[in-house]
């Protein structure tokens, strides 16, 4: 097929003339109109161009439709779609994680609340043991009261520490989710934030809200202090910032400034909230402040009530002990003897030995005790069979063929016998364990005393990991490439003009060469 080379040459010349006119500098109002499309501009959406749109962009060397039809426009559109998709997925992830925080808090709360119901009896056992030990060591009435109150307070302080750890953990999770949302493009900076209600304001106040994770020092019932997380609500009204902090014991807090004056704003913050990830979801309230404050106050009230009971108990028993009518171990109830002074064998459950102590102290007949195993102790040349009980046995155990002196043992030492009686060992007296048997009658050489270690949760390492994750995510966000303009720089325009001119020269040269062979 023959090609009209003259036509091709003419079209090329027209194209170059048009291109050069489009690339030539334009001044005045015409330049502004050329560079800034009017509001009625009907350019195609970025990355969505027809063949005609692409052709117009090509003829104009990117001066027309470049924002929509260039390769970079398609890249920009794809990147934006990915960002939108990433943001939507992140919303789902954050919402799901917050739901997990809420569910975990509720799962923790049920057994914790139930356990608080039983703490009074356990704390009272601690008080009885402290009083008995104080009496046995010859301390004064006042010292016995102090010891009892300290035992109660130490016990409840542990419960406060556990509550604080849960509070710290839940709030650290929410702050982590908040930072994640704020670092993600396409997500509202307030997607995760403390929720507020009961707003008081005057006119249309100019205000701004900010939230931060702060450290607050809390006093425990035993007089010690610990650091805990505080959720700081920072309200700026008329260039004045007022900060109020929600803590483990505060419950909802009023934050802001309101005195019924011009431009003021104040509200009650009561929970962490997360916006819905989709239209089908509701706002999620993950960590409410009030339940933590209720638990804190409950611990304080229980501690206070038992402190008063300790005073009354010492007042009621001191005179009898001081006059020799009762021994130190007589202040121990059966439950305290079972839980605090019982022993267990390495091959048997603690429940077996505790029940043995309880049955003996309660006066049950010998078969019940004999079926549970026995210890044989020689005291003042007389052997007694039953269960030896003490608050602090030497090295935490009793050994067969070992002689003990009560002066070397802290607290009272006594024996629950198979006859249903209680045998007290006087201070400074010696006794020897001559034998021990297990429940099945086999001989054993040693047995341990009952010990309790009240543990507090430790979330420090977890919080450190979360902080590291926040920093890592920020680094990743900072390194994400931003899409740039392809036709926007002068150097790029110059390069394109050069390429077009070179293409024209080559085509003209090729045409001339072919023309010479005609």
Curated annotation (Swiss-Prot):
Q: Which interval of the chain is the signal sequence? A: 1-31
Locations listed in the record: Virion membrane
Keyword Transmembrane recorded: yes
Q: Which GO terms describe its cellular component?
A: membrane; virion membrane
Keywords from the named record:
Glycoprotein, Membrane, Signal, Transmembrane, Transmembrane helix, Virion
Source organism's superkingdom? Answer: Viruses
* Keyword Membrane tagged: yes
Provide the membrane-side ranges marked Extracellular in the record. 32-485
Instruction: Tell me what topology the record assigns in the membrane.
Output: Single-pass type I membrane protein
Q: Where are the transmembrane segments?
A: 486-506
Q: How is it modified after translation?
A: N-glycosylated by a pentasaccharide comprising glucose, glucuronic acid and a terminal 5-N-formyl-legionaminic acid residue.
Q: Which segments does the topology annotation call Cytoplasmic?
A: 507-518
Q: Which residues are glycosylated?
A: 213
* Role played: Envelope protein that may play a role in host-cell attachment and viral genome entry.
Protein name listed in UniProt: Envelope protein
Q: Report the source organism.
A: Halorubrum pleomorphic virus 1
Name the lineage: Viruses, Monodnaviria, Trapavirae, Saleviricota, Huolimaviricetes
């Amino acid at each position: 097929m023959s090609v009209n080379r003259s036509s091709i040459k003419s079209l090329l010349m027209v194209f170059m003339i048009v291109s050069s006119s489009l690339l030539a500098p334009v001044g005045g109002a015409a330049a502004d109109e050329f560079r800034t499309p009017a509001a009625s501009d009907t350019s195609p959406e970025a990355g969505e161009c027809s063949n005609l749109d692409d052709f117009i962009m090509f003829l104009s060397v990117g001066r027309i439709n470049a924002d929509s039809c260039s390769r970079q426009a398609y890249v920009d559109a794809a990147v934006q779609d990915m960002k939108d998709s990433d943001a939507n997925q992140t919303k789902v992830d954050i919402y799901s994680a917050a739901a997990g925080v809420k569910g975990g808090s509720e799962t923790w709360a049920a057994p914790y609340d139930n356990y608080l119901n039983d703490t009074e009896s356990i704390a009272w056992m601690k008080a009885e043991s402290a009083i008995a030990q104080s009496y046995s060591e010859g301390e004064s009435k006042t010292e016995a009261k102090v010891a009892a109150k300290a035992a109660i307070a130490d016990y409840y302080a542990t419960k406060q520490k556990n509550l604080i750890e849960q509070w710290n953990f839940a709030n650290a999770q929410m702050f982590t989710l908040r930072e994640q949302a704020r670092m993600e493009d396409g997500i509202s900076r307030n997607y995760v934030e403390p929720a507020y209600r009961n707003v008081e304001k005057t006119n249309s106040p100019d205000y701004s809200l900010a939230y931060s994770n702060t450290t607050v020092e809390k006093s425990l019932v035993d007089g010690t202090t610990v650091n805990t997380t505080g959720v700081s609500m920072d309200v700026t009204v008329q260039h004045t910032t007022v900060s109020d902090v929600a803590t483990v014991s505060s419950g909802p807090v009023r934050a802001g400034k309101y005195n019924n004056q011009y431009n003021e704003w104040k509200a009650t913050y009561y929970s962490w909230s997360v916006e819905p990830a989709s239209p089908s979801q509701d706002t999620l309230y993950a960590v409410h402040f009030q339940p933590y404050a209720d638990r804190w106050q409950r611990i304080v009230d229980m501690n206070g009530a038992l402190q008063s009971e300790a005073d009354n108990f010492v007042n009621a028993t001191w005179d009898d002990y001081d006059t020799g009518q009762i021994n130190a171990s007589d202040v121990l109830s059966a439950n305290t003897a079972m839980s605090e002074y019982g022993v267990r064998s390495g091959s048997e459950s603690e429940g077996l030995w505790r029940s043995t102590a309880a049955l003996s102290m309660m006066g049950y007949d010998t078969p019940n005790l004999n079926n549970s195993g026995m210890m044989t102790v020689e005291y003042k040349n007389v052997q007694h069979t039953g269960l030896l009980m003490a608050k602090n046995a030497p090295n935490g155990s009793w050994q067969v063929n070992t002689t003990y002196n009560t002066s070397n043992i802290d607290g009272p030492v006594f024996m629950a016998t198979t006859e249903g009686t209680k045998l007290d060992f006087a201070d400074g007296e010696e006794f020897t364990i001559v034998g021990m048997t297990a429940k099945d009658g086999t001989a054993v050489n040693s047995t341990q005393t009952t010990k309790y270690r009240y543990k507090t949760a430790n979330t420090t390492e977890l919080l450190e990991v979360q902080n590291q994750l926040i920093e890592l995510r920020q680094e990743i966000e900072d390194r994400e490439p931003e899409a740039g303009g392809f036709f926007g720089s002068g150097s790029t325009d110059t390069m394109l003009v050069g390429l077009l001119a070179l293409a024209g020269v080559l085509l003209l040269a090729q045409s001339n060469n072919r023309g010479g062979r005609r």
